[in-house]
Amino acid sequence: MDDLSEFFVIEEMFISEPSVAGMKPSTSKTTHSPPPEEPTAPFVNDNLPNPEDEPTIGDLNAFHSGEELHRQRSELARANYEKARPEMIANQRAVTAHLFNRYTEDEERKRVEQQKNKEAMNASTSAPTSSRNGGQSVENRKRRNDVVVAPPTSEEEWKRAQQQHWMGQQQPQMQFQMQQQYHSQQQQYIMMQQQHHHMTGMQQIHHQMPSTSSADSIRSVPTPASSMHQPSPAEMRNGCGMSRNATMDMTCSPMSGGQPIVDENNLAVPEGEWFDKLALAVAEQYNVDTILGPDTYDTFLAELDFSSSESPTKQSPMEMNGDRMPSTAPPPAQNPQHIAQLQQQQNKMRLMQQQQQEMQRIEQQRRQQIMQQQQQQQQQEHQRQQMLLQQQQQQQQMQQHHQMNGGGQFATQAHQQAAYMQQMQRMEQIRHQQQQAQQHQQAQQQHQQQAQHHQMGYGIPNGYPQQMHMHPPAYGAHHMPQPTAFANIN
């Protein structure tokens, strides 16, 4: 029985032995996997991807769904484009036809004017030639060459004014020359007209263009403002120059094909009613969720609410007075003065709000700055106290050391040690500076030498690594044979 118990005890000891602290099985990874070695040859590719990191087929589903969505969207866009395209083409065709018609009209008008000029010239020359004067015929010939330069038509004057305005906008330095040129041309025309009248014996010819009188030439250079909305004479003739603002959508040009053609001539500044309609349209389409949000549009919304709540209050006292106002009658239109006053009030309110916000912002900034300054002062104070504490502790330690080492000589020894350390630091700094200067000089020398080598052709790369040629060779001043690219001739 004792033997058995002894056997069990021994067994127990053997079993529990590995759980002793020294024999615990190691969990560290380094004992199992040795550190990865550097590859011996440079062309061994160690960076192969881990096949377990590859994406699975299921990961592609999201990608494919995205592609499909994109394809559907592009198909939709294509269909929309196909729908809209014929209309776009038709619009372009209308514009092109309009331009072409204008061009042909211009050509026709030019031709007619040339014809008129010829007729006028013939009429003016036919009268005096009956008196067969030699000198007069010379005069006639001279003047005939002059009159070919026709006086400017109203159309040309309008075009010149517009062109002058545009040129002045583009290059300001050109404007003065243009004006000078225009003045001189006007003077020429006046001279020609006077000469013409004189020659024809003051008889007025029916065909000739309206003369440029001195009264006209006073306002010869139109200002940009006047020429901006000035309708062209062609449109004045067609009778659409004046009635612009009433019928914006009905334009007079016959080639517009029922489509409104708006250019710089029939473009009118919109009146107040137009603005009201626009405000209504904006308010109808306004949606809090989609557009910027309530905070930006708060003022506009408040104004809208204010104006809408005001109209019933205006109506109510009239209704309470008596039944003479039927309930179905439209609310009375506010007079423009009242509207202007309202707008002024709103503008004042808005300005005051902005000023208040600005004041609050400045106040906040000032508070923040004061807080920051206080924090900085506290931090500095804290640092100062800590420094004082450290100094006190060091002094205490010194005193303790002094007491332990038994007085006398330690104070002088500490002083000596400090002086020695300072001296060492100074020496180190000087050595460092010298070293830097030397390195700089060497680098400069090396640079010059490299440039020389390149000139002489030594700098051409051969397969060998670059040598540092300029370092002073080792072992005293003896020239040790260095391995060079060429045969060593020393």
UniProtKB/Swiss-Prot annotation:
UniProt GO BP: Notch signaling pathway; positive regulation of DNA-templated transcription; positive regulation of stem cell proliferation; positive regulation of transcription by RNA polymerase II; regulation of mesodermal cell fate specification
Superkingdom, taxonomy of origin: Eukaryota
SUPFAM superfamilies per UniProt: Lag-3 N-terminal region (SSF158851)
Entry annotated with the keyword Cell membrane: no
Low complexity bias spans: 341-359, 391-404, 413-456
Molecular function, one GO term: Notch binding
Region feature Disordered, mapped onto this chain: 18-55, 105-155, 213-235, 307-362, 391-490
Listed InterPro entries: Transcription_activator_LAG-3
GO cellular component terms listed in the entry, alphabetical order: CSL-Notch-Mastermind transcription factor complex; nucleus; RNA polymerase II transcription regulator complex
Effect of disrupting the coding gene: RNAi-mediated knockdown causes multiple defects, including large vulval protrusions in hermaphrodites, premature differentiation of germ cells as sperm, and embryonic arrest around the onset of morphogenesis. RNAi-mediated knockdown causes a partial decrease in apoptosis in germ line cells, in the F1 generation, induced by gamma-irradiation. RNAi-mediated knockdown, during treatment by gamma-irradiation, reduces the expression of the p53 target genes, ced-13 and egl-1.
Bias-annotated ranges (Basic and acidic residues): 105-119
Tissue expression profile of the protein: Expressed in the progenitor zone and the early pachytene region of the hermaphrodite gonad.
Keywords: Activator, Notch signaling pathway, Nucleus, Transcription, Transcription regulation
Subunit structure: Component of a complex consisting of at least a lin-12/Notch intracellular domain (NICD), lag-1, and lag-3. Interacts with a NICD of lin-12/Notch or glp-1/Notch; the interactions are direct.
Job of this protein: glp-1/Notch and lin-12/Notch proteins promote signaling by recruiting lag-3 to target promoters, where it functions as a transcriptional activator, probably as part of a complex with a Notch intracellular domain (NICD) and the transcription regulator lag-1. Involved in the p53-mediated germ-cell apoptotic response to DNA damage, perhaps acting as a transcriptional activator. May regulate phosphatase lip-1 mRNA transcription downstream of glp-1.
Protein name: Protein lag-3
Lineage, highest ranks first: Eukaryota, Metazoa, Ecdysozoa, Nematoda, Chromadorea
Gene: sel-8
